[in-house]
Regions:
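Ribosome-associated RNA-binding proteins
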Residues: 2-197
Length: 197
């Protein structure tokens, strides 16, 4: 049973404050074993700086409600006209209510259908070809159409130990989220259909 009945809500009008990210968890019987959405990263690779990148930044901030950070080129590629250190992409990381809010809208853009190959241990990635497919977004001829990638990371309570500054430690193998659990989370909690290979 999905955590939210999508037939009763309008994804074009929903706001992050209307959602509670704690409801979007997969209960596995023990409070420390429950699985939840850790983060949703939205990435746009533009491949060039300048006006097109600024337009993409405007589109991304409208989509996510956050100011994107600029991603820089790691090396110079003369054929593409890219210099090292030049901004060529955008990234926004969303957490908690904003993450669930954006993920529901992004999944609606792909009809709540994902390929089995998109899943690995605790992570899911998928792309959207045109940002206007996302409910609530609008087409602006002055900006154009951009595609983007969505990367979702799932976690369990206690995962913070691998990111904290003091007394950092690895998460045990048995406590990590497996690929099967990731697929089950998306099917049971978000109501996603999985396309087999």
């Amino acid at each position: 049973m999905p955590a939210i009945d999508l037939s009763t809500i309008d994804l074009r009008a929903i706001k992050p404050s209307d959602l509670d990210w704690r409801k979007f968890t997969l209960d596995t019987g023990h409070p420390m074993r429950r699985i939840f959405i850790w983060s949703v990263a939205v990435n746009m690779g533009i491949g060039q700086s300048g006006e097109r990148l600024e337009k993409a930044a405007k589109v991304m901030s409208e989509l996510t409600g956050r100011t994107p950070s600029y991603r820089l080129a790691h090396k110079s590629i003369k054929d593409f006209g890219i210099r090292r250190g030049e901004p060529i992409g955008l990234l926004v990381t969303l957490r908690r209510n904003e993450a669930v809010w954006f993920l529901l809208r992004a999944l609606a853009a792909v009809d709540f259908t994902l390929r089995e190959e998109s899943f690995n241990a605790g992570n899911v990635s998928f792309g959207i070809r045109e940002h206007i497919l996302v409910p609530g977004s609008r087409y602006d001829p002055a900006l154009g159409i951009f595609g983007f990638d969505v990367a979702v990371t799932l976690a369990r309570p206690g995962f913070r130990v691998q990111y904290r500054r003091r007394a950092r430690a690895d998460v045990g193998k048995d406590h990590r989220v497996s690929r099967e659990e990731t697929i089950r989370f998306f099917q049971d909690v978000l109501g996603v259909r999985i396309l087999k290979r």
